[in-house]
From Swiss-Prot:
This is Ribosomal RNA small subunit methyltransferase A. It catalyses: adenosine(1518)/adenosine(1519) in 16S rRNA + 4 S-adenosyl-L-methionine = N(6)-dimethyladenosine(1518)/N(6)-dimethyladenosine(1519) in 16S rRNA + 4 S-adenosyl-L-homocysteine + 4 H(+). One of its GO terms (molecular function) is 16S rRNA (adenine(1518)-N(6)/adenine(1519)-N(6))-dimethyltransferase activity. Its main location: cytoplasm. SUPFAM superfamilies: S-adenosyl-L-methionine-dependent methyltransferases. The lineage of its organism: Bacteria, Pseudomonadati, Pseudomonadota, Gammaproteobacteria, Alteromonadales. Its EC number is 2.1.1.182. Specifically dimethylates two adjacent adenosines (A1518 and A1519) in the loop of a conserved hairpin near the 3'-end of 16S rRNA in the 30S particle. May play a critical role in biogenesis of 30S subunits. It comes from the Bacteria. One of its GO terms (cellular component) is cytosol. Belongs to the class I-like SAM-binding methyltransferase superfamily. rRNA adenine N(6)-methyltransferase family. RsmA subfamily.
Length: 268
């Protein structure tokens, strides 16, 4: 049998499917998620149910978002899960997670994410950060390093700044390729994202922050002065106490927010 077949389902490359099969890893992830009935539990990409089954055992209801119609059909007919699941068939990148919110209940979101959409999905989920208590995701290890990087690191970039603006980022565990079927060609890791109830560095307009970060990191090897010359002057960098001869990966989240707020003030 092909090593891409698990429980009778053939993994689809276009959906980035790698199914988690290591029981010890599954137990550790479920322990980190800490499922309960005090939150709206949401799984992205339940696949063949490796995380779905143990989480559903611990709660009255679990909402899942799955793109693959074949897997949705399996879940609808699952002898144990079908009565506990609320299933949304569709693309998580387009899904309105806000519709799942319940008064007085924040969401706990988790999933073994397809690596080919993990970064854009992070940016999409940040839009709903105020309605989310925790997020736990299996990601390519490289992405977890980017999420948790510090200024000055090679991994530090636009994703780092935006993730750490919205959330506290905590790497949980590393997961080797043999924990999956089929085995991916890269190492994986689980990360915990804890959205801030009160942001440490509030931004006046997140759209401006997002645009500023994109512009700054488009040419990583060039200086802030070069990359942001159409947004901030040398005098304004000086007012902020930021050395404009530095490269974008040398600038802290707090400094990016300060730059974005100055741009907002100029527009006002």
């Amino acid at each position: 049998m092909s090593n891409k077949v698990h429980l009778g389902h053939t993994a689809r490359k276009r959906f980035g499917q790698n199914f988690l099969t290591d029981g010890n890893v599954i137990d550790r992830i479920v322990g980190a998620i800490a499922p309960d009935n005090h939150h709206v539990m949401v799984e992205i990409g339940p696949g063949l149910g490796a995380l779905t089954e143990p989480v559903a055992e611990a709660v009255d209801n679990l909402t899942v978002v799955e793109l693959d119609r074949d897997l949705v059909e399996r879940l609808h007919h699952h002898p144990v899960l079908k009565d506990k699941l609320t299933i949304h068939q569709g693309d998580a990148l387009q899904f309105d997670f806000g519709q799942l919110s319940v008064p007085g209940k924040k969401m706990k979101v988790f999933g073994n994410l397809p690596y080919n959409i993990s970064t854009p999905l992070m940016f999409h989920l940040f839009e709903f950060a105020e309605q989310i208590e925790t997020m736990h995701f299996m990601l390519q290890k490289e992405v977890v390093l980017r999420l948790s990087a510090s200024p000055g690191c090679k991994a530090y970039g636009r994703l780092t700044v935006m993730a750490q603006y919205f959330c506290q980022v905590v790497p949980v565990l590393e997961v080797p390729p043999h924990s999956f079927t089929p085995a991916p060609k890269v190492d994986s890791a689980v990360v915990r994202l804890l959205p801030y109830a009160v942001k440490p560095f509030p931004c006046k307009d997140v759209t401006v922050l997002r645009h500023l970060c994109t512009t700054a990191f488009n040419m990583r090897r060039k200086t802030l002065r070069n990359n942001l010359k159409h947004m901030l002057s040398d005098d304004e960098f000086e007012q902020l106490g930021i050395d404009s001869s530095q490269r974008p990966e040398q600038i802290s989240v707090q400094q990016y927010v300060a730059m974005a707020n100055m741009v907002c003030d100029k527009k006002a």
